[in-house]
Amino acid sequence: LEQMGYEILQFNYRCRLGEIDLIAKDGAYYVFCEVKYRADERKGSPLEAVDARKQQKIFRTAMYYLTEQQLEDVPCRFDVVGIEGTKITLIKNAFGG
């Protein structure tokens, strides 16, 4: 992600509402990134693991982070990184809040 211009701010942010794997900045955007790994597709693709329930949990945790950091009015988005073996897929703006 750093090679793509992301500035990594925090790994494994945790609060009482949940966890976010990676928080970064991409230009003006604060990016909340979920990273999912699968050695193979027997358990489904890593991207399928970020279901609606997981998305809501990430969203609530991100809003908590922004409030905690007094960043309520900054633009943000939710990206997902799927890793299958050696293949890495980045989906920018994978879901909304």
PLM feature spans:
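A short, N-terminal amphipathic alpha-helix
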Residues: R60-T67
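Domain-level recognition of nuclease-like catalytic cores that cleave nucleotide substrates
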Residues: E68-G97
